[in-house]
Amino acid sequence: MADGGAEPPAPPSSINAGEFLLSILHGSPSPSSQGPQHHQSFALDPAIAAIGPTVNNPFPPSNWQSNGHRPSNHNPPSWPLAFSPPHNLSPNFLGFPQFPPSPFTTNQFDGNQRVSPEDAYRLGFPGTTNPAIQSMVQQQQQQQLPPPQSETRKLVFGSFSGDATQSLNGLHNGNLKYDSNQHEQLMRHPQSTLSNSNMDPNLSHHRNHDLHEQRGGHSGRGNWGHIGNNGRGLKSTPPPPPPGFSSNQRGWDMSLGSKDDDRGMGRNHDQAMGEHSKVWNQSVDFSAEANRLRGLSIQNESKFNLSQQIDHPGPPKGASLHSVSAADAADSFSMLNKEARRGGERREELGQLSKAKREGNANSDEIEDFGEDIVKSLLLEDETGEKDANDGKKDSKTSREKESRVDNRGQRLLGQKARMVKMYMACRNDIHRYDATFIAIYKSLIPAEEELEKQRQLMAHLENLVAKEWPHAKLYLYGSCANSFGFPKSDIDVCLAIEGDDINKSEMLLKLAEILESDNLQNVQALTRARVPIVKLMDPVTGISCDICINNVLAVVNTKLLRDYAQIDVRLRQLAFIVKHWAKSRRVNETYQGTLSSYAYVLMCIHFLQQRRPPILPCLQEMEPTYSVRVDNIRCTYFDNVDRLRNFGSNNRETIAELVWGFFNYWAYAHDYAYNVVSVRTGSILGKREKDWTRRVGNDRHLICIEDPFETSHDLGRVVDKFSIRVLREEFERAARIMHQDPNPCAKLLEPYIPEDNNGQGHN
């Protein structure tokens, strides 16, 4: 025995049970005699046997504890734990019915034995209205005597004897008033079950609360619930969630993610918005809370229709999705934009590829050759150069390099000393004169409501087409049409999110292109050989173009982040609109030509406003997270309750004209291109060495470094090469010079770029 006590004697058959009980109380043992046994028997204190029935327990008794450990104040009984009462006692000893001896060995579960309500709950039987249990009740009422000992019993896990059921029925009006079917529905559909069932939700809540308190106030390791690890690895019913949360249990792996992803995100709790908002203790498992958030969003999934995502972009809270690489997506869109804007033979070939392949009329060699050309064009510059060298084409350059050097831009950069002098120049005194002009330009770039309505019309149409073919696929809106930085006549960017590693994305895209063409959508082009398959189309009814890609989910999350930043301070949208308009006018907004994307320029504006003193924008990813999704191994979390931050930048009184001047002054003279990395994620400047983005021999990629907020290994400036970086910096210097000294800076700043001709004309 664990406590060193001696085993009490078994009751003799020659005395009655009352004398035996008195002998135990007076400490005078009586001689015992045991008859022949046909099965393994265990000693049992008859006083304990008289109090209530027992159950054959297939598990070690220590594992019944909620946390898998024996409490410190728990002393083992002075008798061996018995699994069946002595067969020689009176059938109705002390008025309680007794069991016949079990014919099964102790490692088997006697399905007809009686259990206490607590044992029933631990075994996973939440109620007593199960039809199987009720049938057993009726059988016990009809059979007054227990079955003969020689009768073979069926070993059915979960069945009870009549007395055990009666014991549970004694609590029927208490805190066990729901059956197993209701319990299963509660776990799958918590809100609908509570609203449609006739049970009192407070009863089940009190039941779980009482058991939680009895078990020490915690549920053991991980998500194992009240009974802990019971030796079989089964999960018990978790405690009910608080109002507004779902009980779906899918789980996240908190160990995933890179070191960069964990900065400012390693918190083990989440916050729900609304009437029932509550900050969870760090001991609560983050995966459970995230899945509750996911369930809450799924219940309101109609909110996330494609046309409604213009105002509410992003995956629902708690979603766990798969995404392609941001770098691969950028390469593919760069290629598609290049082909779409160049026009001519290449564009026609691109558009005919998908149609010929779908109809089966294309020559396989021609398709393969064209596919190799596309893939080759998406390779990194050094990889392309290496292939050309191997093929004996040493004089070959990428088309992007050729297009970025159509004139002599980039030859007029200032020296280091001149930049240092200009970096400390004060802003012009009359800068506020141009605020109204910049505001007017900003307002003229906002899409009209009629255009937004046309976009919604096209989105609803696309959603219906996709739902017919892939009912389980999700469509997400991303890009400028949803992040609040879109211009008039901007394309719509749609992500077709579908799970499954066995899905052939290229074939799926070809099928989608076929569906779109059959619905009379025009200019349907499919880029299937790129890293990220894309379909481009134009709606003849609305005149709006649309790009559809597969599983570019990270861009969807980034879209929500940008929109949330835009809600904090209107000066972000004003500055970003001016900068984007400048970049398009000056032709430094084409990634296939080695310049930056619109997304990169918006991140540059956000970072610039984070760095103002006092700051105009906070760093949302460094704040307590209220929004969480997982995209592959990247945990995307940040504070999205931006309504509380509307006055964050009120202490900074800089106007839009001052900010435009300061933005170009920073990127022309103050930014250290050799060592610095712009990081919106941290709201600070990082070093290239910290990111391992140092310049390497044969690779001039990290010349202007802009970190993606979530896929932190992705440098949005990697498209910039050693030629286009000079063009960019020269344009920044031109803009800073105009903002500092030009008498009409608003008009001069946004003058369209005109390439020089053979006579040297142009290049204003």
Curated annotation (Swiss-Prot):
CDD domains: NT_PAP_TUTase. Completely inhibited by 2'-O-methylation on the substrate RNA. One of its GO terms (biological process) is negative regulation of post-transcriptional gene silencing by regulatory ncRNA. It is found in: Cytoplasm; Cytoplasm, P-body. Residues 26-41 have a biased composition (Low complexity). Residues 656-714 form the PAP-associated domain. Its main location: cytoplasm. Its EC number is 2.7.7.52. UTP binds at residues 480, 555-559, 580, 584, 598-599, 708, 714. One of its GO terms (cellular component) is P-body. Interacts with AGO1. UTP:RNA uridylyltransferase with a marked preference for uridine polymerization and a distributive activity for the first added nucleotides. Uridylates oligo(A)-tailed mRNAs to prevent 3' to 5' ribonucleotytic attacks. Reduces the accumulation of oligo(A)-tailed mRNAs. Prevents the accumulation of excessively deadenylated mRNAs to avoid siRNA biogenesis. Uridylation repairs deadenylated extremities to restore the size distribution observed for non-uridylated oligo(A) tails. Can prevent the 3' trimming of mRNAs still engaged on polysomes. This is UTP:RNA uridylyltransferase 1. The gene is URT1.
